[in-house]
């Protein structure tokens, strides 16, 4: 089968045409992939950065954002059948640790990542445990279903705290950040302000519903808050950038008693003014992945009640032009990039 493989310990990802079709275990489902999306993680793997060198076994079929149809099921699988349209949770958990048994599988200490620690979905076929398969309703388009993984990150982060009537600050206008903007507006936030230094992505944030999209290299966030009539700071912060300066600016802009959800991963150690956290009584919450499967339920429910995340998909390529997809993702001048397998 065709697959995109990290086959060398160097910058790049390469297509092969002779990867073996994965076998199906008794508790597994094999999915024929229709569309894949490129994740920021895939770009890290492409770049072969420090994290990738520590983490990715080579060779590895990468990718974990996709939609497809069930091709085959294992002998013990009863919930899915060939032809079902599905996507899949990219975190494979142990099922037996304390958190898994308590229903907190997103906090499993033994998580294995599809396309990171086990073969991924940049391939004509991918195999995952049946417990990780999620059926896609007929009224959700393929290309939207293909980005359920990052949409789930945005949903988990945005819905961590009450948003109705609140003023929300989103730091980082990448695809997950701008989807969080749309979610916050959809569920009833008042002002949703997003900060970044990338004008292309700030423009995308405006299209996704941001009250204000602020280039902090040129604009003063405090002046924007004053212009919006905000006197006490933001009530909820969604840190999506992984940038220490953005996080510190967020802490300064939060109201007393505010709540901050952090999804962005900062490189190394970042110093902050902890007195801001203590004296403001801030609540900080780390976010990882998606709650299994409450986040998925909410993702579908919001789409079916009018949320439109489709503007975040800005580029589409056939799979044989995957290099163009990675090039545009690496340029920073895109939202989500979807690759079509032509099946």
UniProtKB/Swiss-Prot annotation:
Binds 2 Zn(2+) ions per subunit. Its EC number is 1.1.1.103. Signal peptide: none annotated. GO terms for biological process: L-threonine catabolic process to glycine. The keyword Metal-binding applies. Zn(2+) 1 binds at residues 39, 64-65. It is an enzyme of class 1 (oxidoreductase). The active site is at residues 41, 44. Homotetramer. This is L-threonine 3-dehydrogenase. It comes from Anaeromyxobacter sp. (strain Fw109-5).
